[in-house]
Regions:
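Charged low-complexity stretches with an acidic bias
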Residues: 61-89
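N-terminal non-globular leader segments, chiefly Sec-dependent signal peptides
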Residues: 1-40, 79-109
């Protein structure tokens, strides 16, 4: 079993990522971020008490997978429950910029 990341360590990761965001991406992050909270995930999340959710946009959640040491995107149907396990090892700023750029591209269509 892995040792889940502490809230203090997670906040350090978030702060580090925020320093890499600027302009519209940072504004977008400030709109979607939430205080970190544990969300349930049925496949792998039980052992660690869930995964830390850090942002919500529509029916999408950004969460930290501390098994794989990276931020991930999932849909959700019930607030507090991650629908799809994901195991990317992405930095938070990459995930935020990916979502933001995807929204910008779709808005221009």
């Amino acid at each position: 079993m892995w040792i889940p990341i502490s809230l203090t360590e997670l906040k350090e990761c978030i702060s580090h990522a925020e320093l890499k965001l600027d302009g519209e991406s940072l504004n977008f992050w400030n709109l979607i971020k939430i205080p970190p909270q544990k969300w349930k995930e049925k496949e792998y999340g039980n052992d660690g008490g869930g995964f830390w959710a850090v942002a919500v946009f529509g029916n999408t959640v950004i969460f930290y997978n501390d098994i794989e040491d990276g931020f991930n995107i999932s849909s959700y149907a019930v607030y507090g429950q991650i629908s799809e396990y994901a195991s990317e090892q992405a930095e938070l700023n990459w995930v935020v910029e990916r979502i933001y750029n995807s929204l910008k591209q779709n808005a221009q269509l």
